[in-house]
Amino acid sequence: MACPWKFLFKTKFHQYAMNGEKDINNNVEKAPCATSSPVTQDDLQYHNLSKQQNESPQPLVETGKKSPESLVKLDATPLSSPRHVRIKNWGSGMTFQDTLHHKAKGILTCRSKSCLGSIMTPKSLTRGPRDKPTPPDELLPQAIEFVNQYYGSFKEAKIEEHLARVEAVTKEIETTGTYQLTGDELIFATKQAWRNAPRCIGRIQWSNLQVFDARSCSTAREMFEHICRHVRYSTNNGNIRSAITVFPQRSDGKHDFRVWNAQLIRYAGYQMPDGSIRGDPANVEFTQLCIDLGWKPKYGRFDVVPLVLQANGRDPELFEIPPDLVLEVAMEHPKYEWFRELELKWYALPAVANMLLEVGGLEFPGCPFNGWYMGTEIGVRDFCDVQRYNILEEVGRRMGLETHKLASLWKDQAVVEINIAVLHSFQKQNVTIMDHHSAAESFMKYMQNEYRSRGGCPADWIWLVPPMSGSITPVFHQEMLNYVLSPFYYYQVEAWKTHVWQDEKRRPKRREIPLKVLVKAVLFACMLMRKTMASRVRVTILFATETGKSEALAWDLGALFSCAFNPKVVCMDKYRLSCLEEERLLLVVTSTFGNGDCPGNGEKLKKSLFMLKELNNKFRYAVFGLGSSMYPRFCAFAHDIDQKLSHLGASQLTPMGEGDELSGQEDAFRSWAVQTFKAACETFDVRGKQHIQIPKLYTSNVTWDPHHYRLVQDSQPLDLSKALSSMHAKNVFTMRLKSRQNLQSPTSSRATILVELSCEDGQGLNYLPGEHLGVCPGNQPALVQGILERVVDGPTPHQTVRLEALDESGSYWVSDKRLPPCSLSQALTYFLDITTPPTQLLLQKLAQVATEEPERQRLEALCQPSEYSKWKFTNSPTFLEVLEEFPSLRVSAGFLLSQLPILKPRFYSISSSRDHTPTEIHLTVAVVTYHTRDGQGPLHHGVCSTWLNSLKPQDPVPCFVRNASGFHLPEDPSHPCILIGPGTGIAPFRSFWQQRLHDSQHKGVRGGRMTLVFGCRRPDEDHIYQEEMLEMAQKGVLHAVHTAYSRLPGKPKVYVQDILRQQLASEVLRVLHKEPGHLYVCGDVRMARDVAHTLKQLVAAKLKLNEEQVEDYFFQLKSQKRYHEDIFGAVFPYEAKKDRVAVQPSSLEMSAL
């Protein structure tokens, strides 16, 4: 074969004479008209034409008519440049002219109607296996082109050597069908391939690549030795050096040398029996392959997988990497000491091992190479990707961020700190690493150099923009052109998917299923499931919720019923009432809001359901209500639903269930759910009902296992507001006590305090008159100290600890998310409820830690409903009193942190107007104290009221605002109002009159007639806000003030309902019937019942309505949101015998226990 001179040199594109514009690349003057960034259609047409010309090389040397010396002229600088694509930096305004793309090889994945630029491994960047050598006629042009490229890289032309090399390569291909690169050519090719890598941000170092030529090795053992040398050289005690080891080139595709690992060093990922993954999830498949090949797994989080090496096409061999070669960096944070507790680490050497080097038509499928890490590769991708180690939420939680709220930007804060930790850890151990900002800056410098030196720089914007910081890095604003040049590093198909095994016994068990088969199997399974579900009884599960608790339980119920039924979970506001006629089984899970009202998303269904008169379809139903026995109408909305469905003729499947927030709510739900499920199976005659396996959630036992929990020391400082925000899923903020004043007379045996809270910046305060403030209180120090003195085997009270629990498989420890890292003292003070009587479930667990048999038996007896109810209502014991009653209890810190219930916020009506006091919130609080055992027992104190009464000025108060949309002032201020509130029931009305005063003085808005009805014992004892009321009356804000005194000496008791009956009957009728007025009631439940009863009597008498008509009349008033009730209170054990729904008469405190 003669030397193919036509492939030796190609024509270079002629420049077109242009004047005016400065060319960034070579400073040639351009025409002023060529300034637009977009590529025109003419540009594209010319580019296609020039590409065709480029791919059809023209002969540069005619048969012997020109001497070789004349070829030297071809290297001279041309007079003009070829057409270009303009690349602009939108940050700096600088532009580049890309001409290098004319030398691009192949076609990228983009299509005319779709862009595939974000595909991870597109076909255009992937080389598959071969089953025969590259044909010489395909290989020769590529080889000559590479030789030209190689000799063109010299500053001075070496014409004779160049021609001789072309001749030698030609003859070698003609003789052997392939050719071998010289050592210098190999070095040039590997560096040039790095230079051409469009997805690499660190190419500024391309010329410093160390090349190890391992083309002479023939066995896997030799490959391993070369790799060990490579790792040792590159690691360099932390001063990382970039290097590449090149194994023999591909011949016929049947004798490849390949490294099966994706990277030389990588961590194993283990698929655990419970479905969880231990280690790096990205490596689960490869780890299983290693195990199948004989590797013994260690099941750690950071186990280095062995090298799997294939030599000369033979079956792969496993080699453990010597531990002394693997430099690892333990992660720590410069500020957060707890970061060490995450026990994170990462290897220092990022060595890619599974790519293919293409150069001059030759392919090297084994060529591991490395640079050094950019911090975000570890800190963002390896640690934070959800499909990798996924530590983001754990770090955010430990930082005390609002991980439940995306808008808090907790992810952004956490990922920054993780990356700070990575950079700090590497730098502290003197291991090479580069931050992403420096990397982006270096790439911009490299890119500018490349455009000036060779007129282009292939770059993949999607890969080069770092995974964090986005537009604050310069590469974000840089337009880029992506194309493939030769030499190039290509992706490869995983070796184990294409390898032809010589020893079938060593072949790993095939787990893959062909895509067609898999798709058919999935479709078939879906079809079967649809048929199965269609044949099952349909169940509709409705929920209404304010906080999300009912929704969560509804989905849990759906999971249970999916074992034998076809369930559908629907929010009440999405449910069409007409569907009731098609139901067979309806389940309802709902909470009760306020004074027996339904949650907001249940209002629509409630209105339409309660107006329904009859139902033709007599379906089965069951209802579960959630609430707190502290509220006056416990689970009232659920009871209303239950009764209405029954009146419509539906059949109750099981008795209505109740879940008390203060007494084992979830246990009650699980018990009701299982009972309902079993009843449904019986009723609908479900086949195989005896063998149905229900979810583990419903079968958990009540045993206490101390080995299931452990405490780990933690140094993270507690941010109380952030911790409470996370626990209660609320935006908890901190206010400070400005002042506290006792509103009752010094001679009174009781106390009602005005608590004024303030904050520096009132912008965060956003509330309307009538809304509530949730206060997160602290327990009494005496109770906390008493419990601490009885804890066994616990840490010091002020040592910060973190509770960890074994995962379900019992394989490893996970942080318990119920509590933040804190000291035991902090937990007992701010997070755990130590005043509510223990539930029956907690008593069962306490029985297991009693060391005296009589006490254990007594605790077990108390778990029986009758005994428990008597003991609870008689003693109402705090947790400390339980420990004192049963002194043999050996309670550990782990027991307390894992088993005690969470301390709930307490809610108070706000007694101030934001417009009137912009940086303050006022509360009206009755300080609660009472004796248990019918007044003969120990003195108990209300948790929050006592805590507020003990604060000093400027002490912090964690709190949050809760909306009370049903208790706002009328939208039209001209509408008349009647306000009824005895005792602290006056709290929200103070905010009303302050708002009306502000509107009058600053907006010129005169409100409608506002009548106040207040009640207390005596004017000289507990007539709170008396002077303010008189002032508001004088200023015309309150048009009438009526006070009912119930303890005046020598006079009969007068209550607010008496005032209504005796003095305001006409006013009530005028406001409610003749005008679109509003009536507000705030106070304890018995007062509210008496007031409602009195009002109904008055209206019935005046309008001559019967009982049913008057009930409907007031139902309409509530529906129109003209009759408002805000009724809260706490159940007191000593009043339970008198009234099962007893409340503290004048406290708006959510709980006094």
From Swiss-Prot:
PROSITE patterns: FAD_FR, FLAVODOXIN_LIKE, NOS. Binds 1 FAD. Binds 1 FMN. FMN binds at T545, E546, T547, K549, S550, S591, T592, S628, R633, C635, E661, Q665. Keywords: Calcium, Calmodulin-binding, Cytoplasm, FAD, Flavoprotein, FMN, Heme, Iron, Metal-binding, NADP, Oxidoreductase, Phosphoprotein, Ubl conjugation, Zinc. It is an enzyme of class 1 (oxidoreductase). Residues 515-535 are annotated as: Calmodulin-binding. The modification Phosphoserine is found at S234, S578, S892. GO terms for biological process: arginine catabolic process; cell redox homeostasis; cellular response to lipopolysaccharide; cellular response to type II interferon; cellular response to xenobiotic stimulus; circadian rhythm; defense response to bacterium; defense response to Gram-negative bacterium. Changing A679S: In a breast cancer sample; somatic mutation. The modification Phosphotyrosine is found at Y575. FAD binds at H772, R906, Y908, S909, T924, A926, Y930, V943, C944, S945. The keyword NAD does not apply. Its EC number is 1.14.13.39. One of its GO terms (molecular function) is nitric-oxide synthase activity. NADP(+) binds at R750, T929, T984, R1017, S1046, R1047, K1053, Y1055, Q1057, D1090. Residues 730-970 form the FAD-binding FR-type domain. Zn(2+) binds at C110, C115. Heme b binds at C200, Y491. Residues 539-677 form the Flavodoxin-like domain. Homodimer. Interacts with NHERF1. Interacts with GAPDH; induced by oxidatively-modified low-densitity lipoprotein (LDL(ox)). Interacts with S100A8 and S100A9 to form the iNOS-S100A8/9 transnitrosylase complex. Interacts with SPSB1, SPSB2 and SPSB4. Interacts with ELOC and CUL5 in the presence of SPSB1 or SPSB2 or SPSB4. Forms a complex with ASL, ASS1 and HSP90AA1; the complex regulates cell-autonomous L-arginine synthesis and citrulline recycling while channeling extracellular L-arginine to nitric oxide synthesis pathway. Produces nitric oxide (NO) which is a messenger molecule with diverse functions throughout the body. In macrophages, NO mediates tumoricidal and bactericidal actions. Also has nitrosylase activity and mediates cysteine S-nitrosylation of cytoplasmic target proteins such PTGS2/COX2. As component of the iNOS-S100A8/9 transnitrosylase complex involved in the selective inflammatory stimulus-dependent S-nitrosylation of GAPDH on 'Cys-247' implicated in regulation of the GAIT complex activity and probably multiple targets including ANXA5, EZR, MSN and VIM. This is Nitric oxide synthase, inducible. The gene is NOS2.
